[in-house]
Amino acid sequence: MFRQGSNSGNKRMTSGARLSQPIIPLSLPTASSKTLEMGRSSKTNPLNAMGLDHNIATSGGDPEYIMQLVNDVRKFSDVLLSLKEAFHSKESQECSQHVVNERLGELVHVLKAVIGKHQALNSSEILGAAGTVIAKVKGVNFKEVNNENKSTIFGEIHTSIDTLAFTFGNVVSDFLMGDVDGGSRLGYPQARRSRSFENLSEDSRGCSQNDLADHSLSPELSTVEQVDLLLLKNDSGVESALLYAKAWSKYTKDVLAWVEKRLSLDMECAKSFAKMAESAKAVASQQDFMPFRDIYVSAFKNEIEYNHVLLQTAAALQTNKFTQPLLARKNDLDKQRKEIKEQWQRELKKMNESESALKKARLLKMQKREEYEKARSSTSRTEEEQPAAGGRTLEKKRRVEEEALQKAEEAQEQYKACVADLEAKKVSLSNAKSEILAQIRKLVFQCDLTLKAVTVNWFQMQQAQTMPLSVNYQALSEQAKKYEPGQRYSEFVRSLPKERVWLESLSQDITASSKTGMSLHKRSQNSTRSSHGNLSQGSATSMDNHSADEVEGNMQPCKAKIAERRSNSSIDMQVPRTQGSQRAWSSGSAGGGGMCSDSESAGGSSESRSMDSPTASPGDFKRRLPRTPSTGTMSSADDLDEREPPSPSDTGLSEMVMETASSPGPFRNAQMSKAAHTHKLRKLRAPSKCRECDSLVVFHGAECEECSLACHKKCLETLAIQCGHKKLQGRLHLFGIDFAQVVKNSPDGIPFIIKKCTSEIESRALTIKGIYRVNGAKSRVEKLCQAFENGKDLVELSDLHPHDISNVLKLYLRQLPEPLILYRYYNDVIGLAKETQNMDKTDSAKEKSAGEQLGLSTELKRVLFKVRDLLRQLPAPHYKTLQFLITHLHRVSEQAEENKMTASNLGIIFGPTLIKPRHLEAEVSLSSLVDYPHQARMVELLIKHHQMIFDVPLSPMSPTSPTVSQASFGSSIQDKESKLSRHSRSLMDIKESAKLYKRHSSVIIPAQLMEEGKEMKTGDHRVQTSGEGSDVNGVGLTSVDSTSVFNRPGASSRMVQLRPQRAKPVSRPISMPIDRLLNERNSRNTVEHDHSPAAIEETTEPEKPTTPRHTNFYRNPFIDTQTLRRTWDRQYRHYDVTPRTAMIVANLPPSGVQKQPEISMASQSSTSRKDGTSQSGVAPISFRAARTLKPSSPGTFYRPPSGGQLKPSDLLAKSVSRAPTTTTGAIYTTAITVLTTASTSSVMTISTAVTTPPTTPTTSVTVALTSKPTFTTVSRSVSGGAGEGLSESDLLSPVTLSPPQSPGSSTEELSPTDAKPLYQRRSRRMQELEHREAHFV
């Protein structure tokens, strides 16, 4: 136990010695404590870490210092040796290069530490040798080193290393021997040595040897280095430098502001001075005999040239001579200053973190040391008290002591690491400070250089532009001194005409004054008259007291007096006559009230002097007083100031009158917009509110005489409200107002702001990229909104940007309290939009000529018709506005290739605006956000299919076109049947859908008859036409006899006068049930026909027929239709016929014909011959003659079959009368009578009466067929030109045509907008009314 205790004691003593060895010197004032003191003092000055401020006694008698020196020299020697050995390494080139760089960095670090610790070794020889080593090592390219040149390249490096070692040893030996004092050896200030340290560290990172030598060998300290050294010694040097850079930036900013303001004022003044000099030069150039005229003209020219130079100088200073370079330098300084400041703050933060870590480590070390001391003392007491017992307790305490010792050692190591880290951070901070100060210095020097350059430019250019001015002024002053008074006056007198001419003109003036007492002279035709009161009065009126004898006797004195008076009143002198050498003076007499005394001309006259004094001279024959403007009186001083003098180029009084009449008075010089030019402006007489900026106008305001619009003078440049030539109403609250209130003043139900904006966009902005997508400037948009509220529809938009206009339109629609598609229809619209999401979006909208669309799926069509029916429930203003807006958006989408605004993009923009839910809360609900794609989808559908939804025809018919092009029919039988099935749901759908095809129709023209045969085969429909079409634009009507199948004699039809047209069209009832029609067609398929279907057609009765009408017709009921017209009209008034064509068509296939399968027909148009001489016979829809229905044979109208009364076969008789196309303007009237018998068969007689001029031959063709009746009703409108037609069979179900030798089917001519909707069966009441009407006929 004792041995064990002894061993433990020895171990404890050894551990204690090991722990106390590094700790004790920390608390003792030994040499190592200097380092700690230096580290503590470096908190205030980071340069102390480098030893720059540490003054060490260089006495060689201090053995401790000498031992430190020896150790440092040995360490430096080891580093040199390791660097030298790195070049002999057999590793790869990359590894060797890496090792060499590490050894070189270690060498520089050790050398810097040694020189920092021993200031006496800061020698230029050592620094030069070290720089040579660094340069040699950095200059080696290890990739080029091989076995051949290895010895040569590395030999130079070895030599430089040996030189550094030899130099270092010599300096140390000299220092130890005391040959040279440490302070006097170098002879450099301490600051210079610190500069060498920096250069040495920089060279270790790649600086060249020459830079090192320059900095290290320079015997004197430059001003720049002194500045850097002072800032390095200062604790807040970086902050001071940054503050100076900031102050320099602010100073430069102030200088730039002054220069900009000065240059702008100089340019403004130069422009004004140049303008004044131009006008003065023009005036002075016309004065022929005025003194100093040439001098002043030269002065004006010099002034103009000087102002031009001033403008050029100002422009140069604003660009590359002053403003731009200085501003660029200032911006660069601000940017780099911020970066440097952030870098310095990061370094300071690292330093503070290291200091705080060191404090924590010191406290932890002290704490662990105390714990160890306690554990050690406790173990010692235990050993002393119980040396032979308590082994376990002793072992436990020994373990505690060992653990405390281990922790204390760890804390000590951590403290050492923190101290080393703090020292490294101090060195890094010192280096960063040096670099930052150098950067700031370079920046400041560059900024000063730029400021110096621009300042020199400024004063040089100022001196260059003012130098010629003083020289010119000196020359002009010398020239003015040479003038003799009266010189120009003498020249003027010598240039006057001879005495005889003066005697005649003067005697005429005196005679005229004595006889009439007026100042007007009687002049020749080529002289200018001064009958207007604005011309100047002559100054010879004072001569009225002289008689003619005095003038003749004393001519010379008189001439002298005249000259004197002219000189006194030269301001008011008028130009002499220019013909020959004669000159006459205009004078005024007392009787005329036009006299002007000398005192008035000298200074008493107001208007004539103020307006005419610049141009008054004996040679100025164009001087005139401008007339008083219509906007005010001449007594206003502002008017006199704002009026310009008359132009010297005016040559006549008429031109002056025209100018003054068209001038806008006091605002002639103001910059005005297009809208402002429409107003008749005058000065504002009372304070009012400006309609442009909506602020109060007190001074310098303008007011329109017609509409009373008030505006600032400066606002005239941007005024957007035109003059309405009537008093402008008050401000209208337009945005955010109920739609019903806005449309009250709109006759068509569309707000003016929508029409105004869309028309302007369509006129000049359809091809602008991103229209409606790109927003306008907020300030301009708000200004335009205010203009709309102030000026309503008088706002001028031609000067505004299209994006501002589109933004205002979107803003108006967005701010409506309730959108165009009302809230109550939101769910229905969103539901319909959702239905289209799963449909094929690749359905292309292929438009037919009649306005229908093909290629769309049935589901999509059904949804579109639902949308149409839903939108028709909107109020009329909402519906019209929505249709107008969607049509406009469709035009925008048509230019999508240029403006990139497709229907989908427009839907995204206008979807949430036109379709939005009612928000009960303030915020938008999540459901409404989810509905955004559906809203966009619905608007996209409205834009793409707006023709189907809003019943818009593709090309509305023009009633004034000279020829009517051939109509192309694009709906097949299957399409018509699908429409019938779609419309069979409600009678309202039937009536509404009929409006599409009744909107653009004109007069009713019967079918044109042709001889062509039609041939139909399975899978193919070919229409072959031959023969000539008859002219349908005739004036007279003739009757053609027809023969029925029973060989009855022909009877003429009597014209039946129909009721006048109603304003609102209604749909005509249909008798044929749709289900029966579909069932029969599905069962019977396609049958062949060799006849054309019969039809009832109504035509317009001509006002003045050229030929008498024939009344050959059968009257089966023998009732006079003329006497029953009123009763018939009254009973059938609900089914008033509009100017459309109604046909009841019976498809009667012949018996025994083999059935063929039904074939779906595509849209096809019949071929017809075109006659170039045909003209449109379309009559106006309203206010035309009543129409007539002319049956050609007795019988009744078709009555729907009931029960089994009808036989399987019916007999069809068709009489076709045709006239060849020989004239222009023929009108056809066709009457059809269908006989229906209940017992055996149905006999139908079709009589076509064609009225042509008497010279036109007519033909009659009769065809008899027997078949089962199949009827389809087609309502259509026909407007045509001769030579164009379409076979009726194209409008029916698929039929089989007869061979070519059978008579051709009748054709009709249709306009491009004709359409043929099919309708469902009418109710029984309608059938009874129709049957009753047939009996009346």
Swiss-Prot record:
Q: List where Polar residues composition bias occurs.
A: 1-13, 525-545, 568-579, 960-973, 1161-1177, 1295-1310
Q: Where is this site: Arginine finger?
A: 773
| PROSITE patterns to which the protein is assigned, alphabetical | F_BAR (PS51741), RHOGAP (PS50238), ZF_DAG_PE_1 (PS00479), ZF_DAG_PE_2 (PS50081)
- Residues forming coiled coils: 326-443
One CC-aspect GO term: cytoplasm
- Where do Low complexity bias regions lie? 596-613
Family annotation (InterPro entries): AH/BAR_dom_sf, C1-like_sf, F_BAR, GMIP/FCHO2-like_FCH, PE/DAG-bd, RHG29_45_N, Rho_GTPase_activation_prot, RhoGAP
Question: What superkingdom does the record give?
Answer: Eukaryota
Would I find Disulfide bond among this entry's keywords? no
What are the boundaries of the signal sequence?
Answer: none
Q: Name one Pfam family in it.
A: GMIP-like_FCH
What's this protein's function?
A: GTPase activator for the Rho-type GTPases by converting them to an inactive GDP-bound state. Has strong activity toward RHOA, and weaker activity toward RAC1 and CDC42.
Question: What's the protein name?
Answer: Rho GTPase-activating protein 29
According to its UniProt entry, this protein's organism is: Danio rerio
Higher taxonomy = Eukaryota, Metazoa, Chordata, Craniata, Vertebrata
**Gene encoding it?**
arhgap29
